[in-house]
């Protein structure tokens, strides 16, 4: 039975090799893999203890025997049975003991470990997981100490970071040329080290990384201060000595330059806020707005706008099925109009969709704006799969339901996409519609007319869908769905619908979505009288 369980586990793990950090749903398999290894390790320990018990028993017997034999060797051997047993022991029984001592009890455990190791997370996964923590740190304005203490909202399990963990985080950032996070995490490692936490990491190693990272951020004075501490700890540290000379020479040059220019402020001194270095500028122009919305800040839903939002029963333009059983519809935003539908998916349907999707999950891709080729990107961290109606009746049923709710046809819509977000899982601001006029898909199916997004899980913290352009934040609620049009009736893209999936702070986020295309919907959503209808 155990062999069949192992085979099933390895089969599942074999299907999902790589980039575990991008999907919490797939990371759960690692929990069971680790549990199996613990059981295997305990079995190995039991075998070693049994072996050691036999050896100890033999040693005790031999000790009492040799005490007797060495007290009067000739008298002992005068007894022919003693003489025979001595020869027999040395010829056979000590050989048996030798074989027992040499018996390798590790074989079963090592075999299990070796087989499973090929499915373990790799260096890329560890780096991705570390960067995910840093992403959460930035988005939700968490200091390193809060993360190190495991103080996250809504968590059931408390877990802390050691000096070794913080040092590892800092090294990951350092290797990426990210000196801002290097400083944050090396400072935390140093703080915990100074507080007496047991660790294998030397303070000199921490100061070595920290001093150079601080220098890279432009804080020459502090770099010198930290390097001096390093030299005191390790006078023979070669790099520290040469760095000190270089830093002091730079400082002297700056002082001379300041005197010439009559400057009272060090021009290289970096900006700080409450003693923390300013975060470097990002490639994303709306970064601050996007992250503020993820935190629930900056939502522009004024009381006046709130009065325009209503709840109602939705019958899909008098669809016969929905007249009998209408859906609850709630306005989330007035312009552009975004609505939420309740009780769209049942718990049973959600679990079935997840079951179908999980074996197919692969790293979600984006289309390169320059080449048009699908590729993975750091700004989209999740895994997704595509489900066809032939996969299961539930897929066909859900597709039909979305068709009834929206009044649009699914004949030209894309397959049902299922996505699971991993550690710090996110999808930074993007458009659902294509802005490439020569995209071959546009010629056949038209552009992505509308988005129907199903929330298939609650999220304890984070994970909102936000619209930076007009300041809306929509929070996941299991079983509900949100819907909006990406195009005006004229077919022009509505650039206000640029949206993002915020990083998941605590929890596991599952969603599924359907993109409706223009073709087949010309009469179901006809053109308006103006370009912006």
Residue ranges and their predicted role:
Residues 2-481, 487-533:
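Fe(II)/2-oxoglutarate oxygenase catalytic core
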């Amino acid at each position: 039975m155990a062999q069949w369980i192992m085979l099933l586990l390895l089969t599942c793990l074999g299907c999902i090799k790589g980039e575990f950090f991008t999907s919490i749903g797939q990371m759960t398999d690692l929990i069971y893999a680790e549990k199996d290894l613990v059981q295997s390790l305990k079995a190995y320990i039991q075998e070693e203890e049994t072996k050691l018990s036999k050896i100890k028993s033999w040693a005790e017997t031999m000790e009492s025997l040799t005490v007797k034999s060495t007290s009067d060797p000739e008298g002992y051997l005068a007894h022919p049975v003693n003489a025979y047993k001595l020869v027999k022991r040395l010829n056979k029984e000590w050989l048996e003991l030798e074989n027992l001592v040499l018996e390798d009890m590790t074989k079963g455990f090592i075999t299990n470990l070796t087989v499973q190791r090929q499915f373990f997370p790799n260096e890329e996964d560890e780096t991705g997981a570390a960067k995910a923590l840093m992403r959460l740190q930035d988005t939700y304005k968490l200091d390193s100490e809060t993360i190190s203490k495991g103080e996250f909202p809504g968590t059931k399990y408390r877990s802390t970071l050691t000096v070794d963990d913080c040092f590892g985080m800092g090294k990951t950032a350092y290797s990426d040329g990210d000196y801002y996070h290097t400083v944050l995490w090396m400072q935390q490692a140093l703080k915990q080290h100074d507080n007496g936490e047991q660790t294998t990491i030397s303070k000199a190693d921490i100061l070595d990384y920290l001093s150079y990272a601080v220098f890279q951020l432009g804080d020459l004075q502090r770099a010198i201060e930290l390097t001096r501490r390093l030299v005191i700890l390790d006078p023979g540290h070669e790099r520290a000595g040469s760095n000190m000379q270089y830093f002091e020479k730079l400082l002297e040059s700056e002082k001379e330059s300041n005197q010439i220019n009559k400057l009272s402020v060090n021009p290289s001194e970096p900006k700080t806020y409450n003693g923390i270095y300013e975060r470097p500028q990002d490639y994303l122009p709306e970064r601050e707005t996007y992250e503020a919305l993820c935190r629930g800040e900056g939502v522009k839903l004024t009381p006046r706008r709130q009065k325009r939002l209503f709840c109602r029963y939705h019958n899909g333009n008098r669809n016969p099925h929905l007249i009998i059983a209408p859906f609850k519809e709630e306005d989330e935003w007035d312009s552009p109009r975004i609505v939420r539908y309740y009780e769209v998916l049942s718990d049973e349907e959600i679990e079935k969709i997840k079951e179908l999707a999980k074996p197919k999950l692969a790293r979600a891709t984006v289309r390169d704006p320059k080449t048009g080729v699908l590729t993975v990107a750091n700004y989209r961290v999740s895994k997704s799969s595509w489900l066809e109606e032939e996969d299961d009746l539930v897929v066909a049923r859900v597709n039909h339901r979305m068709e009834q709710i929206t009044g649009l046809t699914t004949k030209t819509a894309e397959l049902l996409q299922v996505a699971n977000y991993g550690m710090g899982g996110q999808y930074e601001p993007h458009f659902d519609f294509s802005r490439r006029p020569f995209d071959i898909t546009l010629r056949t199916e038209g552009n992505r007319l509308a988005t129907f997004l199903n929330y298939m899980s609650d999220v304890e913290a984070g994970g909102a869908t936000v619209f930076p352009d007009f300041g809306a934040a929509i929070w996941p609620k299991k079983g509900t769905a949100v819907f909006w049009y990406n195009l005006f009736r004229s077919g022009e893209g509505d650039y206000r619908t640029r949206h993002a999936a915020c990083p998941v702070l605590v929890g596991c986020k599952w969603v599924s979505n359907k993109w409706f295309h223009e073709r087949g919907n010309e009469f179901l959503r006809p053109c308006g009288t103006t370009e912006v209808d």
